[in-house]
Amino acid sequence: MAATDVTPVQTSALLSSLHDFQRTFNENQRVKKLIKNWNRFLKAESTDTSEIFTVTIQDLAANEIQPGCSIPEDNEDLVTLQASEEALVRIFTGKYNPAHALIDGALAVFCSERDKVKLEAIAMVIWGL
């Protein structure tokens, strides 16, 4: 009889925070008004753990979270957020204002200026930041 592997499953703090963000994002009716006709791929890239996850925002919802990112870097619908895992977790749980993270040099955002404004508005609506 084969032994059952009972090794604890390692969970990612970043992935957990992205699921929290997804739930909060999808439950907020004001966000739905804000993101009308705004379909994007949010790439969360941890600079210290090399973890990458992509959140697909389509049809007024954060629909899925996938490991890695298969979207080409030059795709205009790709929004890349780079920071340490701790900073990303704090940002996606509403504990660290992304605008402050940018000013502090803790966060790098690669997208159009219009998308940066949209992200800031989303943070303000969701967390009142």
Question: What does each model-identified segment do?
Answer:
Residues 2-129:
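Feature captures hydrophobic
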